[in-house]
């Protein structure tokens, strides 16, 4: 009887070891709020409505197990302002939540646009909305309790790091913290993250040079260094244009490290070449036993229909493979032109 029980336990162990678990992660670029976007969302009753922005993309967002975006503004309260120091209506966050996002990276060069009040109010509202912020913190205790961010989904444990190159020269007011790309700090955070025993470690980095379509030497060097330190995948933002994706072979396992140097803008009022097209990237991670691999990496483009191109006077994200019936002929021309330029 004991022998039979031992065999059964052994079989159960093997079945458990061979069980496949998957998680899909969707990443988008800069969720921006220029003045034209704020003005277009204003309603007759002085409230703001952003639902139109995500109407055509929310199904894709909600299909992912986790959806992550770079929240490149603040919720610092009135007066609402766009560039150069952003503060957006609270309704913008509500629309992001309703669209299906789960995690917002908040460490970027606009984190301190409304100083301490803006940083802390942004975190409070993100928490209240049931979303998760990563990259900025009220104080050291807040950071210690929340960072590195560890999320478990479908039996897969994922740790997230998040840091920025700077904050546009605005000094951090103590005790607030904005994670930086300092290598000593990054190395320490990687050690803490690895001690959590995640199945994958992903770094969300605000880095690179604005409007440059190729990664800088600094980005290339930092990516290699981070992978050497134990980071599995890197997702980049800041340049406001799309940069290449690299697949770097793992040195020990039959898998790859994904390095997305820049996703570009997701939604903004930028009309510069390459500034109105963003990249949406989906990583599928598969865990078998104690090994997790990158099962697939897919990407597609989205185009921002600005208010001046729209029949409704509103902003809207349009997937590259979608031609809405209410898209104006000129809007269709501009969308086609932008996508063709991006694919060159």
Where are the predicted features?
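Hydrophobic h-region of N-terminal signal peptides that target proteins for export
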Residues: 5, 9-17
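Acidic, metal/ion-coordinating pockets
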Residues: 19-344
């Amino acid at each position: 009887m004991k022998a039979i029980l031992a065999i059964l336990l052994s079989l159960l162990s093997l079945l458990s070891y061979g069980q496949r678990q998957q998680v899909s992660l969707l990443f988008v670029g800069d969720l921006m709020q220029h003045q034209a976007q704020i003005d277009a969302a204003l309603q007759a009753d002085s409230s703001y409505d952003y639902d139109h922005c995500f109407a055509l993309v929310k199904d894709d967002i909600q299909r992912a197990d986790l959806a992550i975006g770079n929240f490149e503004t603040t919720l610092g309260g009135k007066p609402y302002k766009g560039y150069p120091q952003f503060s957006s209506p609270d309704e913008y966050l509500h629309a992001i939540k309703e669209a299906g996002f789960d995690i917002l990276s908040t460490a970027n060069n606009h984190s301190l646009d409304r100083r301490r009040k803006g940083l802390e109010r942004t975190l409070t509202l993100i928490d209240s909305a049931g979303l998760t912020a990563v990259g900025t913190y009220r104080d050291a205790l807040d950071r210690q309790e929340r960072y590195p961010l560890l999320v478990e989904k479908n039996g897969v444990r994922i740790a997230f790091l998040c840091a920025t190159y700077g904050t546009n020269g605005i000094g951090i007011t103590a005790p607030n913290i904005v994670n930086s790309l300092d290598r000593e700090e990054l190395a320490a955070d990687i050690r803490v993250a690895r001690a959590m025993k995640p199945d994958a470690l992903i770094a969300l980095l605000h880095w690179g040079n604005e409007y440059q379509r190729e990664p800088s030497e600094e980005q290339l060097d930092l990516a290699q260094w981070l992978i050497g330190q134990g980071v599995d995948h890197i997702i980049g933002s800041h340049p406001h244009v799309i940069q290449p994706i690299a697949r770097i072979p793992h040195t020990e396992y039959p898998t790859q490290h994904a390095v997305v140097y820049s996703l570009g803008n997701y939604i903004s009022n930028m009309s510069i070449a390459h500034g109105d097209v963003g990249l949406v990237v989906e990583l599928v991670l598969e865990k078998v036993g104690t090994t997790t691999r990158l099962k697939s990496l897919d990407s597609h483009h989205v185009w921002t229909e600005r208010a001046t191109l729209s029949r409704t006077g509103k902003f809207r994200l349009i997937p590259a493979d979608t031609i809405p019936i209410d898209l104006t002929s000129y809007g269709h021309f501009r969308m086609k032109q932008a996508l063709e330029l991006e694919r060159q």
